[in-house]
């Protein structure tokens, strides 16, 4: 794709149109003023409006723009131990058979990343031609640099070291790119994010909703520092966000992920979706259970459900509140907000059930459904809702700050716990008991479990976490389970169920024991890229 993209660099009008065609209202104004055939490098970069139009085009095609809801990003939760997405392409991932010729997942992420990087490089090479206020120009340059750095963060997370392209290339240059090291990629991205943060505003008016904030640049930098295990740097970065005093922990939880919560001050980075125009096609359709008129494409594993603590703060294995005949009673309220629980959740006046005929198939893959993004009483177009897509929340900042402090061997005090993890789990709608544990080993496990339940199905957070913690292979190498189907598994024949142990009587879903290789923690470099450029090397085990 790098060669395909950079082959176009000599056609200036085509490059400009890449930034224009995805727009709506602004596009008509421009075309009324100037025919497409007249677009040229000299005529386009002449006004502030041109710069803003080009910047909007970068946003729209990026991983935080209108492409953010593409399936291959939403389904990457199924590259973790949290969920099962019953789709043929995702099945390849989940069964351990993803190959370099895949285009939906491995190919799409790579292509979108480098398309955005190319647009940013072209933008930065030309924006100085525009006469506009110096502070405003610095701000739009900062936004463009953020979008490029964000793509490099994503590419580094999915593929490891990748070609590091910082300028518009000639065709010959594009055909000879080699993979930079992971450190080179992450160092460049962090440097760009530092520069961007200096010129980005801490807040924006409602009219600029969806544009990048200072905290977003710092939060992605923090993610990179956690990835690189630069704990001291991460502590400083996350503290800088906290000290901005611009974001809060919303007292609500479920509403944050619905259209009514899209202005929450907890949200640091999101994609602005507009129903019927740039609508979200997934939340009210793909996640909506079939019993309520949706597809229910993705199902949570019992392994995730079991991670939600009891209201007394203890796990189900040790809490006196746990009753195996009523397994969903007295649990962390985030369980009820996140997952449709079979024969328990009531939604739109109807109890959630998964027919046995649907278990293990596209409908009801595990017997559990994802409730987090589905709006009760939704009456709009299911395939084009106005639900924004959240990428980063302030809760991530606080939990990451605590983790970085822990791993940097800094003092763990009750005050620190209260400022971070207890603030997250203490929101009014959740109100879980405070964490008081200061033993470093025990607290590490508490933080990791807290991240798992707080951010369940939130884009790539779980995948990012198990990768950087070095446990991806271990947590994936197991038999996964769905809902409990019987108390008498020995005589149950409708579906394959576990006969003994912790998950006795539960549906046996995907068995990944012995089917994985450690190299599969990374996606394969797309085969088409290697065919175009023989200097690109493939990731291990593909």
Describe each region flagged by the PLM:
Residues 2-13:
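Bacterial N-terminal signal peptides that target proteins for export
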